[in-house]
Amino acid sequence: MSDRKEFRDLATPAEAHEAIASLNLDPEPETVSLDDARGRILAERVDADLDVPGFDRASMDGYAVRASDTFGADEADPATLELVGTVHAGAEPDVFVGDGECAEISTGAVLPDGADAVVMVEKTDEVPDEERVEIRTSLAPGDAVMPAGADIAAGQRAFGPDTEL
């Protein structure tokens, strides 16, 4: 004789379907505070209310410039720009980059008004004893800039249904 259990009272397929259908496998959604949301599952899609990041930012250390000021610049014939300030990550820029100007900028810092590109520090030389920087490469608008909304744009899906928080 075997130690194996035998199940003689099996449910019919109809009974099995009825038993499964009676389970509450699709609970009603409920709203909870953010403090209580950890480990919960989203019932529906969540769209971003705002751009992330909410500003254009530098994707590397260097100088915020107007790309048009670097047109034709190269190692043999650099563009020379006036240094008008510094922008640090986490700080609001207090400088405007005008024609022929640049601002030193840290990775992740907000791009100052007037600038539309960032040149990496390795492609520059500070002019000794002057507030001027030589740019040894040409840039296009948007070079080394992460635009506002690059991670998630306002109105785009931030989280989908069934996402665990």
Where would I find each of the regions flagged by the language model?
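Short, low-complexity N-terminal leaders and the immediately following helix N-cap/first helix
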Residues: 1-74, 147
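Short, glycine/charged-enriched hinge/interface segments at domain edges or termini
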Residues: 11, 64-165
